[in-house]
């Protein structure tokens, strides 16, 4: 059976399909719907404070008794100067003026927020914790393992996969360059991140690690799931496929933009957050490209552009908001998450029967 392997056994799920923990875009309904359909729903905790994460976990548990996970951002060493912030504020001033916004006061709470997330995951006995942007400390990994939390790391290269296994991860997401949203890279210099496609990355990682590999990047339906399994993956992680679901927290602006875009419309940019991410191209990305080398690292840039993105979204201006999307938008639907899951499973079974 295609759906019975080490990963499904480890995560206590029926199907090896993981809904990506997209920060700012998941809802309890989305997470629970995927879990209730036999996959692993994942809370995107990246931007949550402690109380928000606790409430989200409690709400998910009201909707499902099945396994689910929480995705967290691993803090990274920030590299920026005061002149970078001053220059960026000057470059962003025309956008703020047009939207009647004041210059924000930047507050960096990334390290403390991460520690609180880990404490909450342990306190609430969350079954699975997924990491992006790096590998946590040995101490944190030990604490989570002692609490029987299954750990999933993210790798965009073979070297990152090896580092994840060595650190004690139970499984690894092999994130191909087709994936929407932030790149999970952490070993390469910030402007030279690996851009290896899913079909190349997955088998190369499978061949050098002994733990389950989860394919991610451009996978939208049953065909992508089966292709990943043939490459050696024991599961898939899907983001954009669930982002356009009516159960996600995506705005209608973003949902419509993805549904109406094509495979050539996305670009890699750090304009919005300070970390390279794939999204639909727009005016802000193009105008900020001239400053690409001077953009402050995440979370500084993310803080500096936050009010602009929120104000633009409120007035329906898609030229000034981030529209994260993978490279397979033509395959996106607005179905409820449980319908997306059943369609994927039915398509896989039909293909298997035909073959």
From Swiss-Prot:
GO terms for molecular function: nitronate monooxygenase activity; nucleotide binding. Its EC number is 1.13.12.-. Signal peptide: none annotated. Binds 1 FMN per subunit. It is an enzyme of class 1 (oxidoreductase). Pfam families: NMO. Its cofactor is FMN. The keyword Mitochondrion does not apply. SUPFAM superfamilies: Inosine monophosphate dehydrogenase (IMPDH). InterPro entries: Aldolase_TIM (IPR013785), NMO (IPR004136). FMN binds at residues 71, 175, 180, 218, 237-240. It comes from the Bacteria. It catalyses: 3 propionate 3-nitronate + 3 O2 + H2O = 3 3-oxopropanoate + 2 nitrate + nitrite + H2O2 + 3 H(+). GO terms for biological process: response to toxic substance. Keywords: Detoxification, Flavoprotein, FMN, Monooxygenase, Nucleotide-binding, Oxidoreductase. Belongs to the nitronate monooxygenase family. NMO class I subfamily. Nitronate monooxygenase that uses molecular oxygen to catalyze the oxidative denitrification of alkyl nitronates. Acts on propionate 3-nitronate (P3N), the presumed physiological substrate. Probably functions in the detoxification of P3N, a metabolic poison produced by plants and fungi as a defense mechanism. P3N is a potent irreversible inhibitor of the key enzyme succinate dehydrogenase in the Krebs cycle and electron transport chain. P3N has been shown to be a toxic metabolite to bacteria, plants, fungi, mammals or any organism that uses succinate dehydrogenase. This is Probable nitronate monooxygenase.
């Amino acid at each position: 059976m295609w759906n019975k392997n080490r990963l499904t056994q480890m995560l206590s799920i029926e199907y090896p399909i993981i809904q990506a923990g997209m920060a700012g875009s998941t809802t309890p309904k989305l997470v629970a719907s995927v879990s209730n359909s036999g996959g692993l729903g994942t809370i995107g905790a990246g931007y949550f404070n402690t109380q928000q994460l606790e409430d989200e976990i409690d709400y998910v548990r009201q909707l499902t008794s099945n396994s689910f996970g929480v995705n967290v951002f691993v803090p990274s060493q920030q590299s920026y100067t005061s002149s970078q912030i001053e220059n960026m504020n000057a470059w962003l001033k025309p956008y703020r003026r047009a939207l009647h916004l004041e210059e924000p006061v930047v507050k960096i709470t990334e390290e403390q927020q991460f520690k609180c997330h880990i404490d909450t995951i342990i306190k609430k006995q969350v079954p699975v914790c997924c990491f992006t942007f790096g590998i946590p400390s040995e101490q944190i990994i030990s604490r989570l393992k002692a609490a029987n939390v299954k750990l999933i790391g993210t790798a965009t290269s073979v070297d990152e996969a090896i580092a994840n296994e060595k650190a004690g991860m139970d499984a690894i997401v092999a994130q191909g360059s087709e994936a929407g949203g932030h790149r999970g890279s952490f070993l390469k210099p910030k402007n030279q991140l690996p851009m290896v496609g899913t079909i190349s990355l997955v088998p190369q990682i499978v061949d050098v690690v002994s733990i389950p590999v989860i394919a991610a990047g451009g996978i939208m339906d049953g065909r992508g799931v089966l292709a990943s399994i043939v490459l050696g993956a024991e599961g898939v992680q899907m983001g954009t496929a669930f982002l356009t679901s009516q159960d996600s927290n995506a705005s209608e602006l973003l949902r419509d933009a993805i549904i109406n875009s094509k495979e050539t419309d996305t670009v890699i940019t750090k304009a919005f957050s300070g970390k390279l991410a794939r999204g639909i191209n727009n005016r802000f990305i193009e105008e900020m490209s001239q400053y690409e080398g001077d953009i402050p690292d995440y979370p500084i840039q993310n803080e500096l552009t936050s009010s602009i993105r929120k104000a633009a979204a409120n007035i329906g201006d898609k030229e000034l908001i981030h529209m994260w999307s993978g490279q397979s938008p033509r395959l996106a639907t607005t179905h409820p998450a449980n319908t997306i899951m059943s369609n994927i499973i039915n398509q896989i079974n039909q293909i298997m029967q035909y073959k």
